[in-house]
């Protein structure tokens, strides 16, 4: 299920555009996640009080967390599938501390794709989208495997 060198290059090229504004992209990803799947907000005590999109857009904490999420994901993507060292602590915290189900990782993956389509439509062609979906699926599958090792049924 690995990606070819060409697919990784497509992923990293579009990710370079994300990195010009990690906080803005991250905030938009989280807003889409919470709008499309309001149940995910329950996992974020810090953001439960944010009820409207305007409140979410005005939240510096949400922007900061979006930056954290996409910084971590970028570090994983840059490893081109050789992300064991980066993935292990992430899986550990998401399984034991935050208790984030794999399903929610699917939801945020969808939100990432939507944000890329929206913000980078001129560069996010079908082949790039397919490569990014494949990279995110690889990430989710590897997280799910770590969850299983940790005994988390998420």
UniProtKB/Swiss-Prot annotation:
Transmembrane segments: none annotated. Nitrite binds at residue 65. O2 binds at residue 65. Its main location: cytoplasm. Its EC number is 1.7.-.-, 1.11.1.-. InterPro entries: Globin, Globin-like_sf, Myoglobin. PROSITE patterns: GLOBIN. GO terms for cellular component: extracellular exosome; sarcoplasm. Keywords: Cytoplasm, Heme, Iron, Metal-binding, Muscle protein, Oxidoreductase, Oxygen transport, Phosphoprotein, Transport. Gene3D superfamilies: 6.10.140.2100, 6.10.140.2110. The keyword Cytoplasm applies. It catalyses: Fe(III)-heme b-[protein] + nitric oxide + H2O = Fe(II)-heme b-[protein] + nitrite + 2 H(+); H2O2 + AH2 = A + 2 H2O. It holds the Pfam family Globin. Belongs to the globin family. Monomeric. This is Myoglobin. It comes from Vulpes chama (Cape fox).
């Amino acid at each position: 299920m690995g990606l070819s060198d060409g697919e990784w290059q497509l992923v990293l090229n579009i990710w370079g555009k994300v990195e010009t504004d990690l906080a803005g992209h991250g905030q938009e990803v989280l807003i889409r996640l919470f709008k499309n799947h309001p149940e995910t907000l329950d996992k974020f005590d810090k953001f439960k009080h944010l009820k409207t999109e305007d409140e979410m857009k005005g939240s510096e904490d949400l922007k900061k967390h979006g930056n954290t999420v996409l910084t971590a994901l970028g570090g994983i993507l840059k490893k081109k599938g050789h992300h064991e060292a980066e993935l292990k602590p992430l899986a550990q915290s998401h399984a034991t501390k935050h208790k984030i189900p794999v399903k929610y990782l699917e939801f945020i993956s969808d939100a990432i794709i939507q944000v890329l389509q929206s913000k980078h439509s001129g560069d996010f062609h079908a082949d790039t989208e397919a490569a990014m979906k494949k990279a995110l699926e690889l990430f989710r599958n590897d997280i799910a495997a770590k969850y299983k090792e940790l005994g988390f049924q998420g």
